[in-house]
Amino acid sequence: MAVLVNNLQEEISVEENLLKLVESVVKVSLESEGYSPDAEVGLIFVDDNYIRSLNAEYRGIDKATDVLSFALNEGEEMPEEEEAEDLLGDIVISLPTAQRQAAEYGHSFNREVAYLTAHGSLHLLGYDHMTEEDRQVMRQKEEGILERLGINR
């Protein structure tokens, strides 16, 4: 699996250990759902202004958020593994928001970025949290991904 990382922000330094961590999170997320080792995901680190403009343009919500996902097959049923496109889509994470949330929730910045990466990966795979039941399923999968990597609160 390829994780193509693009850092478009300058506020927070992106260290090699963070790059390895997010790559591992994406790989475990996709493997746990039976996706091909040939699958690719784009991961883009941005600042609050950038993610705010994306959120306004694509969701009609004019405020910053922590993570957005853009699946290439948005609104379509996920194809069978052998029919799947190699590139699944992009995950966009605001690192300044992740840093604030880590402090607010009392855990590390890396743990927060790992969680947001798992959350975004699951959105690319068709999961959502529009209902309480869907939210619980998604949260269970997110925590399972982090546990497999030994990432705890």
From Swiss-Prot:
EC number(s) reported in the record: 3.1.-.-
Keyword Hydrolase on entry: yes
Cofactor(s) the protein requires to work: Zn(2+)
GO molecular function: metalloendopeptidase activity; RNA endonuclease activity; zinc ion binding
Binding positions (Zn(2+)): 119, 123, 129
Pfam families: YbeY
Similarity comment: family membership: Belongs to the endoribonuclease YbeY family.
Protein name listed in UniProt: Endoribonuclease YbeY
Species of origin: Desulforamulus reducens (strain ATCC BAA-1160 / DSM 100696 / MI-1)
Classification of source organism: Bacteria, Bacillati, Bacillota, Clostridia, Eubacteriales
